[in-house]
Amino acid sequence: MNRESETAKHVNLGTRDSSTNTIRDLSRVLVVGKSPINRVVVSKIVERSGLRPISEPPDIAAKTLRTLVPGAIVLDGGPDNKDCDNLMPGIEMLRRTSGKSLPPVILLSTKNGTPESLGLAKVVDVVVAKPITPERLQPVIDRLINR
């Protein structure tokens, strides 16, 4: 199976600024977190929704977001909800540029709360409390992707 031809079915080229071409692929979900185990668990849940996960640590994910606009982003906040803080400005810029708060962003948090209560209303659409289970996360992914 040729991955390039498969991706081409879902890819749209866009421009973020005059010097950067970005690829929009709504079938992909960027899964970001420092814990490789949590990234694998979340990626399997994403696959159950019929989507293709891209699993990366925060430093690599920042580079990926410069060239790819995924259908959604899932951030694992880690033990203190700060693991992905360096990505927030880039995600906020993507969402402002889209004009529609896209891509949707899910934060996996150790605390219960709303994006507003955590001070992330401009960047995060939904907060899902840990532990991560398919019963909690999959309906949220499905709802955000289909909005």
Predicted segment positions?
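A short, hydrophobic beta-strand element within the central beta-sheet of small alpha/beta folds
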Residues: 98-113
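Short acidic active-site motifs
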Residues: 59-64, 83, 115-116
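Short acidic, S/G/P-rich loop/turn micro-motifs used as interaction or catalytic elements
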Residues: 35-38, 76-83, 112-114, 134
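Acidic, metal-coordinating helix/loop segments flanking the phosphotransfer/catalytic sites
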Residues: 56-72, 76
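A Lys-centered signature of the CheY-like receiver
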Residues: 130
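Conserved phosphotransfer microenvironments
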Residues: 74-101
